[in-house]
Amino acid sequence: MKLKKITLILIIILAVLVLIAGAATFTSNNSIIETPKGNASVVVTGDVMFARNMAGVLSLDESPFRHVENVTGSADLLLINFENAATTSGCAVKGDVPLKCDPSYVPLAKANNNTVAALANNHLFDYGTDGMKDTLKSLDDAGITHIGAGNNESQARQTASSDINGRNITIINYMDSNNFKEYSTDVMPQANGSNPGYSAYDSDVAKCQIQDAKANGSDVVIVYFHFGNEYSHSPNPDQEKMAHEVIDYGADAV
């Protein structure tokens, strides 16, 4: 009887040890192990414009990026400023230097499978709101993500987000409304409420968007501005102020 009690006690102890070991294994197997994040490459261009004398080149159906495609095509993400309307409209609303291209050329701007086109610039609305809508449709049809302009403020303020090798990259696009003041808001409209337009820089909006992106797990936030004086090689005080503001709000690159 005594032997049975000892045997029973040993069985209970062994069972407890097995449970403890199992619990330890369970805890170990279910602990959060952070997956290492890989590198992510982003190529950023300046103005990409298919207007003026570009039609003769584009009609050859060759990539305008062919001499740099080893750079633009090999990156994980390509960010461009698409600086013209893509429309067949002949009704320019801007009297000087209106820029447009035929919508059929838009796919040539996709020099990378992951291409983002920034539209907050001073030529998107050269052919009015209809020209802007034609441009958005052409970019959608070409599979190019677009930011910085839209049919309303919510659409214009949308950001682009990509998950690359375990890293989340968010891109935000603004234009400085202090530039090009010679044009009325009818010619160069700022998106406001339900009204179409470009995404104008607003300090409070930028702070909210950047901090929201970070709070939602974005590893890298890029703010892509269209600002500064044309043909100038140095930043003006407004540019410096805005750049420092968004960096203070948490932007990683400007």
Task: Name each region found by the language model.
Residues 1-9:
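Short, low-complexity patches enriched in S/T/P/G
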Residues 8-254:
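Acidic, metal/ion-coordinating pockets
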